[in-house]
């Protein structure tokens, strides 16, 4: 399942380095949320525990990986790469419970700088383990080729993804693969990047392991976690600005795509000053109406006297090919755009319609015992303690203090 410490998304490593530099003593708590109707079993939980305790705990940065990071990721400081060389996952940071209703409860607690790497690793493990247990291969493959189900599945999925990639390429949609967390499995993920990596419009992958394997660019900058964690230290109202300023302190203008929706786009634009707008190469959209947001971003840059055509808007909210094509056409000549496409590539819900991807997240819940929240521009994506969400919605003028979230 997890073959390497680099089998993770780049932004987990970039945020880890920033945490080590600015908040080395902070402690974090994360919670697993299953938004779907899937249930789990004792056998599933026992195998998940075994993988965490026996397999993931042994993963370490190899000498080859160490050299590759030094040669290909200049934004990582030598001291951080040394830290990563000595890093080991600590299974004691992960607590798993199966409830009487067969729901999975998972909590991660530990120093922020170490516990930060668990999220993607656990989500991709949970996903692959779930589909290993529940998939009926007979439904995935052509009956005529049932003698070799795994290879037939790979061939059919390769063709399916290849057609998607060619369509994006033909339409000039610059895109990257963002699908580690909810992938069907490691081998299928590998095949996806293999199929896509030679396309002119394929800009890279968020997965550092596959970026190394296929010689493409590792893609990623800031996740919601960075902004949420910073909010625990300065409060919600100016958390975006504090988080973006801190990112600049660490990376000096590298990796500079600002994530817009942690507390909704309105407070983002209030905090995204002319200084930040000039330093950051662009903005990422991850929830809400993308057309409306594109207009707002373009207008914001123009108000600040910045040419939008010198910036980039990255769309990453549950994208399908048709979405990307539509957005590319809408933004053409107004602002540069690119696309981060995740589950659609690594666990496509149309291809696997009989047993679709898990709708799950693992989100930061507390920093140093202080609850943190994500509000989003899509109500269903909000996460956090109910009382903390209620207060956050009030602070940002979205709801009255006594209104239910």
Swiss-Prot record:
Entry-annotated residues carrying Phosphohistidine: 224
Domain of life according to the entry: Archaea
Keywords associated with the record: Ligase, Phosphoprotein, Pyridine nucleotide biosynthesis
Record has Phosphoprotein as a keyword: yes
GO MF annotation: an example: nicotinate phosphoribosyltransferase activity
InterPro entries reported in the protein's UniProt record: N/Namide_PRibTrfase, NAPRTase_N, Nic_PRibTrfase, Nic_PRibTrfase-Fam, Nicotinate_pribotase-like_C
GO terms (BP aspect): NAD biosynthetic process via the salvage pathway
Pathway entry: Cofactor biosynthesis; NAD(+) biosynthesis; nicotinate D-ribonucleotide from nicotinate: step 1/1
Reactions performed catalytically: nicotinate + 5-phospho-alpha-D-ribose 1-diphosphate + ATP + H2O = nicotinate beta-D-ribonucleotide + ADP + phosphate + diphosphate
UniProt modification remark: Transiently phosphorylated on a His residue during the reaction cycle. Phosphorylation strongly increases the affinity for substrates and increases the rate of nicotinate D-ribonucleotide production. Dephosphorylation regenerates the low-affinity form of the enzyme, leading to product release.
EC number annotated for this UniProt entry: 6.3.4.21
Cellular component terms (Gene Ontology): cytosol
Cited function: Catalyzes the synthesis of beta-nicotinate D-ribonucleotide from nicotinate and 5-phospho-D-ribose 1-phosphate at the expense of ATP.
Family: Belongs to the NAPRTase family.
Name under which the protein is recorded: Nicotinate phosphoribosyltransferase
Organism of derivation: Methanococcoides burtonii (strain DSM 6242 / NBRC 107633 / OCM 468 / ACE-M)
């Amino acid at each position: 399942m997890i073959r390497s410490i680099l089998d993770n998304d780049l932004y987990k490593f970039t945020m880890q380095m920033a945490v080590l530099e600015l908040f080395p003593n902070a402690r974090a708590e994360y919670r697993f949320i299953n938004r779907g109707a899937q249930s789990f079993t004792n056998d599933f939980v026992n195998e998940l525990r075994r993988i965490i305790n026996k397999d993931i705990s042994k993963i370490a940065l190899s000498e080859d990986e160490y050299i590759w990071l030094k040669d290909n990721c200049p934004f990582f400081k030598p001291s951080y790469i040394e830290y990563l060389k000595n890093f080991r996952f600590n299974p004691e940071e992960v607590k798993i419970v199966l409830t009487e209703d067969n729901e999975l409860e998972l909590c991660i607690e530990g120093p922020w700088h170490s516990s930060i790497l668990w999220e993607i690793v656990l989500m991709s493990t949970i996903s692959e383990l779930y589909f290993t247990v529940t998939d009926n291969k007979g439904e995935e493959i052509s009956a005529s080729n049932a003698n070799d189900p795994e290879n037939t599945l790979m061939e059919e999925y390769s063709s399916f993804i290849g057609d998607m990639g060619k369509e994006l390429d033909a339409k000039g949609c610059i895109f990257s693969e963002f699908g580690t967390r909810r992938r069907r499995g490691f081998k299928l993920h590998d095949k996806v990047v293999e199929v896509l990596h030679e396309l002119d419009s394929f800009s890279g992958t968020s997965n550092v392991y596959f970026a190394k394997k296929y010689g493409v660019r590792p893609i990623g900058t800031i996740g919601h976690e960075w902004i949420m964690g910073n909010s625990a230290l300065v409060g919600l109202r100016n958390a975006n600005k504090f988080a973006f300023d801190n990112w600049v302190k660490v990376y000096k203008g590298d990796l500079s795509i600002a994530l817009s929706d942690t507390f909704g786009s309105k407070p983002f634009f209030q905090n995204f000053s002319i200084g930040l707008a000039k330093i950051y190469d662009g903005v990422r959209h991850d929830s809400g109406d993308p057309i409306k947001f594109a207009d707002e971003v373009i207008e914001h840059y123009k108000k600040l006297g910045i040419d939008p055509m010198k910036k980039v808007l990255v769309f990453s909210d549950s994208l399908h090919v048709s979405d990307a094509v539509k957005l590319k056409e809408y933004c053409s000549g107004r602002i540069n755009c690119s696309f981060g496409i995740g589950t659609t590539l690594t666990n496509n819900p149309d291809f696997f319609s009989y047993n679709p991807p898990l709708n799950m997240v693992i989100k930061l819940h507390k920093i140093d015992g202080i609850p943190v929240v994500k509000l989003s521009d899509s109500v269903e994506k909000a996460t956090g303690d109910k009382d903390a969400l209620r207060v956050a919605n009030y602070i940002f003028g979205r709801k009255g203090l006594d209104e239910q979230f």
